[in-house]
């Protein structure tokens, strides 16, 4: 989802008002911030979003741990959007930020990094290691969380039965095509049986 400035400001205020969340991290980052730490938070927040079935997680610069808007000078001279390409080089599956937003709140510059969830069945790694949130910090992704994410790969939703579904929910062209293929398959089987019988195979 792409946010407008006003929509994102409302969302940030909601996140600030909410209790502690494993998919949101606020950092002052008044001037600079470690690129390696950004990568670790990317991995951790991406994995936590996956485990909670969410479409995004957030790393927000310019807001203190006690949720005061203080502003940030991080990459103010340029290079902010190039961070998308820089992150790709050290994540698996070439994951990067969904979007990087730069906005003003209370006359202060704020940067909001929109992070995607880990791909189903594959924990997001940074430089080969997968991370998770642990209270106010990050830690290696625990094995139980690794197993939870990896177990998703075995789910085949196409085999699931939708109890409420009716024939009206199916595409008419797809039904016609399926009938044609089924009919052809049955005819091929009959021909094969006849062939085997004639030649006593």
Language model regions located:
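Conserved N-terminal catalytic/coupling substructures associated with nucleotide/phosphate chemistry
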Residues: 1-201
């Amino acid at each position: 989802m792409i946010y407008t400035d006003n929509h994102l400001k409302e969302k940030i205020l909601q996140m600030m008002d909410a209790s502690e969340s494993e998919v949101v991290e606020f950092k002052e980052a008044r001037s600079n911030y470690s690129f390696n730490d950004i990568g670790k938070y990317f991995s951790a927040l991406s994995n936590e979003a996956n485990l909670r079935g969410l479409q995004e997680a957030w790393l927000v610069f310019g807001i203190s741990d006690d949720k005061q808007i203080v502003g940030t000078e991080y990459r103010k001279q340029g290079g902010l959007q190039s961070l998308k390409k820089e992150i790709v080089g050290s994540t698996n599956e070439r994951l990067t930020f969904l979007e990087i937003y730069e906005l003003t709140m209370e006359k202060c510059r704020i940067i909001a990094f929109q992070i995607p969830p880990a791909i189903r069945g594959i924990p997001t790694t940074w430089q080969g290691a997968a991370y998770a949130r642990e209270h106010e910090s990050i830690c290696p992704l625990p094995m139980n969380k690794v197993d939870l994410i990896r177990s998703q790969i075995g789910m085949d939703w196409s085999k699931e039965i939708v109890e409420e579904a009716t024939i009206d929910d199916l595409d008419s062209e797809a039904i016609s095509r399926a009938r044609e293929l089924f009919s052809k398959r049955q005819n091929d089987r009959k021909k094969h049986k006849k062939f085997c019988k004639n030649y006593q195979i």
